[in-house]
Structure formats: structure tokens, C-alpha cells
Amino acid sequence: GPPNARQMLERLDIDIIWLPNLTKPEELLSSIEMVSERLARAEVAEALIEDVNRGLIQAAANSSNWAEDAPTVLFLLEPPGKSTSGMGGGLNSKADTLIFLAGGKNAATEFSGFKPVSTESLVAMNPDVILVGQSDRHGGSPESIQAMIATPALSEVSAIEKGAVYAVPLDDLAFGPRL
């Protein structure tokens, strides 16, 4: 979370386990181990780690089917609007990891983390698939997604031409045991 929130919690003088901001599945496994150590629940952690590893192996096996012809995928936290940029997940982001685990190639290779994505840059990326994160409080609204799809400047983007624009739960970026 924000640094000021962490500082406030540290002042409470209570035992807190600080976990890193996860961007890769391996980091999830080490976080599970950290928590289990502090809670003295190694047996529970072992079972959970085995379950997560099974899921990762299955995801890798499923995604290997796409290896040569993997679609390019753009994950947007917010789609670009008429006068605003959207927010896209570049390399070394949770979005990048999810795209990889699903068997795709990240279309946003020009930057790392989450950065603004303009209409022009979306045209240049020309992804085969666009995923737009949604939640109750954040992400693209159904209206903003429809507005993006209806934007004339984006009409020749492959994902829009093929109708391959999907709303996905923004919670998918919260790497936890259900990864």
C-alpha cells in the first residue's frame, strides 16, 4: 500500500507481516512461506504451495499450445477515452505475468509496469486481444469499454475488429492462492 499507510500501521506497535508487492508466481510462493513461518503453520503452507504449483504447471501446459502463434494481449486498467489516456500493463507487471500464464504475449513491450496508453499507442500496439480490468470501485466501466470500441481511430485495431475485447475481474491482478 501507500508508504504513509505503512508508516501509520508501524506506529501502532503491533506485529505485522509485510509482504512484497507480488508480480511473479514465485513471489507468491515465498510470501506463503513467510506467513506460514510467522504463524507456525508449515503443513498448511506446504499443501497450499503444492496446490499453487499444480495450477502453475497446468497453466504452463495449457499455454504451450499457443507457443508459436501466441496472441498479443493488452491488459488495460482503464481504456483510453476521447481526451484521456488509459492505463496499460507493460513488461514486469502483474498483467504481464497473467498474459504469460494464459499463453499470450504482452502487446505493451515498450514500457515496464503500468503506464498511460493513448489511442495512438493502442493503434501502434495493435493487440489481438484486449482485456479491461473491472471492479466495483476501479477499472473500466462497461460504458468506457463500449466508448473505446466505438472510437473511430481504433476501428482497425485487431482486437476491436475481431470483437476480442473482454472485461475481466480486476481482482485477477491480486496475486493470491487462487492465481
Locate predicted features.
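Acidic/His-rich segments in extracytoplasmic proteins that coordinate ligands and/or metal ions
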Residues: 1-38, 115-158
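Alpha-helical, coiled-coil/dimerization segments enriched in small aliphatic residues
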Residues: 87-114
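Short acidic/glycine-rich loop or secondary-structure boundary segments that cap or lie
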Residues: 82-86, 139-141
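Small-molecule-sensing regulatory modules
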Residues: 100, 109, 117-120, 125, ...
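Short gly/pro-enriched beta-turn/loop segments at secondary-structure junctions
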Residues: 67-71, 101, 124-126
